[in-house]
C-alpha cells in the first residue's frame, strides 16, 4: 500500500531542501503540541519489542534506532520525534554562541544517489537557547544526547574553550554528550583529529565530567575520511581518555560513483553512498576496541537490512538522518520491525548478541 509520505514526498522535493526541512520541523512541533494528535501518532509509529532494548553506560534505550545530529539543531523537535518511535535523539551540533552557519543554499538532495550534501556550517541558536529548549521538553521517556562543536570564528588553538563552555552548559540537562570534531563544514575542525589536540580536548572534558554530580557518557564522533592509521590513533586517544562510545561516522568529502548533477556541490555527503564506508569504519573500530567502548553506527541507513548489517559490523546503536528524508516518518517503526524479524530468524535472543558477529567471525 502506498504510504502517505510517498504521496507527499514529490511535493516536498519540489521545494528547496532546507525549506522542506523547515516545514517538516514546523509540522513536528505542531503535532507534538496539538490535542489528541500525539496519541494518534504514537499509535501509528511507536512499535516496540523487548528484543531490541539496549543498555549503554547506565542508560536504557527502548530500541537502538536514533535520530542523528543535524536534524534537530535547536532541540525543539524532541517531543515530535519521540512520537515517531525513536529510541534516542541527538540534538545539535550546538555551539557556545549563536551563529547563522554558511549562506544558503547549503543543503542539497541527490535523489539519483539517495543522498544529501550539506554545508550548513554549524548553524546554531547557541547553548543558552538549546538549554532552554531541553528544559521545556515534555518527552522524558526518550534518551536525548547533545552534540557539541566550536564557533566558526573561534581560533583552533582556543577550540577547547568552546567545547568546555558548551559541555558545562548542557551536560547536566542531557543524557549524553557527543563531541563533534569531524564535520567537514567548519574550516580546520578536522585538525582536532590530530592526537595531541584530541588528547588535550578529551582529557579536559572527561576531567570536567568526573566533577559533575552525575557524570554523563561522552561519545566521540569520527570522520569516515581518515586513513587506517589515523583512525587507530583517534580510537586510541578516545580509549585512553575514557570516552563512553564512538559515533561512526560523520559525512564524507568523497564523491565516488555519484550520478546527480548536484554531486559537484561542496560539503559533506550522507546517505546511500556512505553505507559501505560507514560500515567499514564501524568494523575497524570494533576490531580495535572489541566493543568496549561501543560504537554508535550512522551513515547510509535507510532499511532494516542496512541497520542489521551495521549492528553485525559492531554498532550497538544506530542513527538516521538522510534515510528519514527519503523514507519518511515511518522509518523507525519499519526498521525496528525488520530488525526484530532478522534477529529471531538468526536465533538471537537479544540485539546485543548480534553486535559485532560479522567481525568476530
UniProtKB/Swiss-Prot annotation:
Keywords: Cell membrane, Flavoprotein, FMN, Membrane, Oxidoreductase, Pyrimidine biosynthesis. SUPFAM superfamilies: FMN-linked oxidoreductases. Monomer. This is Dihydroorotate dehydrogenase (quinone). The active site is at 183 (nucleophile). Pathway: Pyrimidine metabolism; UMP biosynthesis via de novo pathway; orotate from (S)-dihydroorotate (quinone route): step 1/1. FMN binds at residues 69-73, 93, 147, 180, 221, 249, 271, 300, 321-322. Its cofactor is FMN. Substrate binds at residues 73, 118-122, 180, 185, 250-251. GO terms for cellular component: cytoplasm; plasma membrane. The gene is pyrD. Belongs to the dihydroorotate dehydrogenase family. Type 2 subfamily. Its EC number is 1.3.5.2. HAMAP family: DHO_dh_type2. It is found in: Cell membrane. It catalyses: (S)-dihydroorotate + a quinone = orotate + a quinol. CDD domains: DHOD_2_like (cd04738).
Amino acid at each position: 500500500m502506498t504510504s502517505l509520505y510517498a504521496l507527499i514526498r514529490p511535493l516536498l522535493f519540489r521545494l528547496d531542501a532546507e525549506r522542506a526541512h523547515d516545514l517538516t520541523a514546523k509540522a513536528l512541533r505542531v503535532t507534538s503540541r496539538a490535542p489528541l494528535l500525539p496519541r494518534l501518532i504514537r499509535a501509528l509509529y511507536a512499535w516496540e519489542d523487548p528484543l531490541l532494548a539496549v543498555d549503554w553506560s547506565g542508560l536504557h534505550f527502548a530500541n537502538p534506532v536514533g535520530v542523528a545530529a543535524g536534524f534537530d539543531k535547536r532541540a525543539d523537535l524532541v517531543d515530535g520525534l519521540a512520537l515517531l518511535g525513536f529510541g534516542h535523539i541527538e540534538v545539535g551540533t550546538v555551539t557556545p554562541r549563536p551563529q547563522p552557519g554558511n549562506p544558503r543554499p547549503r543543503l542539497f538532495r541527490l535523489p539519483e544517489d539517495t543522498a544529501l550534501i550539506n554545508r550548513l556550517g554549524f548553524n546554531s541558536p547557541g547553548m543558552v537557547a538549546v538549554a532552554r529548549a531541553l528544559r521545556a521538553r515534555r518527552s522524558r521517556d526518550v534518551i536525548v544526547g547533545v552534540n557539541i562543536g566550536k564557533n566558526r570564528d573561534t581560533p583552533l588553538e582556543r577550540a577547547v574553550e568552546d567545547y568546555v563552555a558548551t559541555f558545562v552548559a548542557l551536560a547536566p540537562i542531557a543524557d549524553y554528550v557527543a563531541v563533534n570534531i569531524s564535520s567537514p563544514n567548519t574550516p580546520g575542525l578536522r585538525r582536532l583529529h590530530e592526537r595531541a589536540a584530541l588528547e588535550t580536548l578529551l582529557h579536559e572534558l572527561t576531567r570536567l565530567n568526573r566533577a559533575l554530580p552525575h557524570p554523563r557518557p561522552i561519545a566521540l564522533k569520527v570522520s569516515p575520511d581518515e586513513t587506517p592509521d589515523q583512525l587507530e590513533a583517534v580510537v586510541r586517544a578516545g580509549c585512553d581518555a575514557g570516552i563512553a562510545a564512538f559515533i561512526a561516522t560523520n559525512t564524507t568529502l568523497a564523491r565516488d560513483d555519484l550520478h546527480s548533477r548536484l554531486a559537484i556541490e561542496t560539503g559533506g555527503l550522507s546517505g546511500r553512498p556512505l553505507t559501505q564506508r560507514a560500515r567499514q569504519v564501524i568494523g575497524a573500530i570494533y576490531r580495535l576496541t572489541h566493543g568496549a567502548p561501543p560504537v554508535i553506527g550512522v551513515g547510509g541507513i535507510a532499511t532494516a537490512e542496512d541497520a542489521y548489517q551495521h549492528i553485525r559490523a559492531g554498532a550497538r546503536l544506530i542513527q538516521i538522518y538522510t534515510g528519514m528524508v527519503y523514507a519518511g516518518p515511518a522509518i523507525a517503526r519499519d526498521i525496528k520491525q525488520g530488525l526484530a524479524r532478522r534477529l529471531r530468524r538468526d536465533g538471537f535472543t537479544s540485539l546485543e548478541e548480534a553486535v559485532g558477529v560479522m567481525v568476530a567471525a
